[in-house]
Amino acid sequence: MSIIVALDAKSQYDALSIADQLDPSLCRVKVGKELFTHDGPQTVRILQDRGFELFLDLKFHDIPNTTAQAVCAAADLGVWMVNVHASGGRKMMETCVERLKAGNYRTQLIAVTVLTSMGREDLRDIGLDVEPFEQVKRLAQLTQESGLDGVVCSAQEAKMLRDLLGTEFALVTPGIRPEGANADDQKRIVTPKQAMLDGSTHLVIGRPITKSERPNEMLKQILSSLA
């Protein structure tokens, strides 16, 4: 079990201001689209120099060759983990896995199933008349069959996926909120302890830590709750 702190900051300065209050031996960090688009690979390198393993959360989704090139570019940065959209399909995901193996990269590759902000009506709007957990199940199985290391999923689906996919498949879970925290824009949320019990291997936690007056103390409290 590990905690990934989401550095959902607008600038490198803001991200580093948070990271400098965290102990890299206690967590990994996640860099997403806004921060990476604003400041690029430099922010990744600085965080790595500070001792953090990094999850580059860019959710690549394109034709197979283009997606694989982007994944390998992320691996060239030395990131610990990168992700793609499982809805890009089997060929796209398999091509990414093949390229990473050919390059002897150690970067873990996972796939996004259904965004945690999406409910049944949101899926219906894009032509998928299914419950979110059914689509998660379908895409998670496809991801495993394609050779990836794991999926991003809601903790509410984690137990079902753990039973379905076995013990070696990573389940990376956003929408984690400690007891009493605001749900913000996440529709499918759960506490850290419950997520761990349900089979999640990595917990993505943002605002409850990054907006805390003492981020590292909040991180320690969450880790203690998992003991």
From Swiss-Prot:
Pathway in which this enzyme or protein is active: Pyrimidine metabolism; UMP biosynthesis via de novo pathway; UMP from orotate: step 2/2
PROSITE patterns per record: OMPDECASE (PS00156)
UniProt-listed GO biological process terms: 'de novo' pyrimidine nucleobase biosynthetic process; 'de novo' UMP biosynthetic process
Protein residues bound to substrate: 8, 30, 57-66, 116, 177, 186, 206-207
Catalytic activity: orotidine 5'-phosphate + H(+) = UMP + CO2
Record's protein name: Orotidine 5'-phosphate decarboxylase
EC number: 4.1.1.23
Keywords, in A-Z order: Decarboxylase, Lyase, Pyrimidine biosynthesis
NCBIfam families in alphabetical order: PRK00230.1, pyrF
Record InterPro entries: Aldolase_TIM, OMPdecase, OMPdecase_AS, OMPdecase_bac, OMPdeCOase_dom, RibuloseP-bd_barrel
Originating organism: Acinetobacter baylyi (strain ATCC 33305 / BD413 / ADP1)
Function per UniProt: Catalyzes the decarboxylation of orotidine 5'-monophosphate (OMP) to uridine 5'-monophosphate (UMP).
Gene this protein is translated from: pyrF
Gene Ontology CC annotation, any one: cytosol
Family under the similarity heading: Belongs to the OMP decarboxylase family. Type 1 subfamily.
Any one GO molecular function term: orotidine-5'-phosphate decarboxylase activity
Quaternary state and interactors: Homodimer.
Active-site residues annotated for this sequence: 59
Lineage: Bacteria, Pseudomonadati, Pseudomonadota, Gammaproteobacteria, Moraxellales
Pfam families: OMPdecase
